[in-house]
């Protein structure tokens, strides 16, 4: 279990290789990954409704893995739906995708949740915003 007995940052986003996800959200956590660790965070996890192969390639292409971010795919959207963070946008081909959010989880309990009002925004859920609340 990735969360038991640990302090973990999870940030969810609509999709690998998509605009804001690649240019704003992931980079915000790449910039702050070391600072989170200095504040006692055990892991920073990026979660997207994609398969693990896409997430591994995206990790390599963005350098997120080298920055210490664990890139996880929620291929069936089971976790995303389970926490109520799924949305559909059929005009752009998004079905059961993740809303954009960031959270701090302490021993399996969400202690901070920052959810964007729109998947095209990346301010409330950015790494710098979450870091400032710790």
Residue ranges and their predicted role:
Residues 1-134:
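Chalcogenol-based redox active-site neighborhoods
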């Amino acid at each position: 279990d990735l969360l038991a007995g640990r302090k973990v940052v999870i940030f969810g986003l609509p999709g690998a290789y998509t605009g804001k996800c690649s240019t704003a959200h992931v980079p915000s956590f790449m910039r702050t990954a070391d600072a989170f660790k200095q504040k006692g965070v055990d892991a920073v996890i990026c979660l997207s409704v994609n398969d693990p192969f896409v997430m591994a390639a995206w990790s390599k292409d963005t350098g997120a893995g080298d920055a210490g971010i664990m890139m996880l795919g929620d291929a069936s959207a089971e976790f995303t739906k389970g926490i109520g963070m799924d949305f559909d946008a059929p005009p752009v081909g998004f079905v059961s995708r993740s809303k954009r959010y960031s959270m701090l989880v302490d021993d399996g309990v969400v202690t901070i949740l920052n959810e964007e009002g729109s998947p095209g925004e990346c301010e409330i859920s950015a790494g710098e915003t979450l870091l400032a609340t710790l």
